[in-house]
Amino acid sequence: MQNQIYYDYDTDSIPLGQGGMGIVYPGRCFRTDNETEYIPVAIKLVTNTAQDMIERAMREASIQIDHPNLLRMYGFIPNMEPDPFTHEMKPRYYVVMENLDGVSLESMLEGVFCTKTGSDIGYARELYDMGCNDRRNFTVEIMSAILKGVACLHRSGYIHRDLDPSNIMITRDREIKIIDYGVCKPVASINGADAKLTMSGSIIGKVDYAAPELLAGDVQHHNFTTDVYALGILMYRLFVGALPFEGDNSSIMKAHLSGEVPAGNISDPGIRRIVEKAVRKQQDERYQSVDVMLEDLSAVSGGLAVQDSDGKGNGAHGTWVPVLAATVTGLAAGIATAFMI
């Protein structure tokens, strides 16, 4: 119990997920003055209790942004509990977040539409069918939602640094949400204490979607364009149906650092030009704003074609031409808001 909020979870239940930081279980949160009403939540038990992992968990829990395309975080809970074997009181740490009923974008792309508990996600099936018949609109629908979420995250001062299909959820409620803020960081802290958390790791994010500055360990140059690069690779995969670079991690890293994304594989000229701008090696030549990238995608969706940009990745405002359309800490506040929904 913390800040008049009571929570519980069942360790015998099927975990919602598991990673290097901990195990996520389905849970419930109650008001202490009304235990008959509760909201379903996901509770991450932090099993890696190294100090840097605890600090990352606290940072992740603090990213409490209310947006339909972002996972809602409710707070961080430190608690003293008896060890199951020695019965000695030891600290345990939890991150409380929104419980999503859905499947990852990665699963959907592989033709998996059921959750671990056997629940069928109809929206994921619809998107998959759309991808089989209309790759352009499939790409636009998914990327529009993702770009809106990332744009909000950026406006709040954070970069995600791990954008890939496994960290995007498609829900029963027909929402597409970005999840997992484990390596998300405030841009303002790049040269501060948070940089040490970054330096303690090896490679941030998935190699398949990693920008050159991520792979080079160039922490001081991690910024909003780092996410833009990953979004470009993701857009490529959605349209083409495959990643631009394949092979072992070493060869993929070399390709991201010095190779060219084969954008010619994208048959739609508008989508192709957006991807080309997003994945440029030089950061100042990429889109400098996800909002502008979204504007370009919206224009393409509306039957307009984006022309070559100004070389700074700032979009093509004024250059659109018509074409034929082709087909916790802060736990109480977070939970209180959730109860009001």
Predicted regions and their residues:
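Conserved activation segment of eukaryotic-like protein kinases, specifically the C-terminal portion
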Residues: 197-214
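Conserved short submotifs of the Hanks-type protein kinase catalytic core
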Residues: 88-104, 108, 112
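Activation segment signature within eukaryotic-like protein kinase domains
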Residues: 142-143
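Protein kinase glycine-rich loop
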Residues: 13-19, 24
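Short beta-strand micro-motifs within the conserved protein kinase catalytic domain, predominantly
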Residues: 72-91
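Protein kinase catalytic-loop region centered on the HRD/HxD motif
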Residues: 148-158
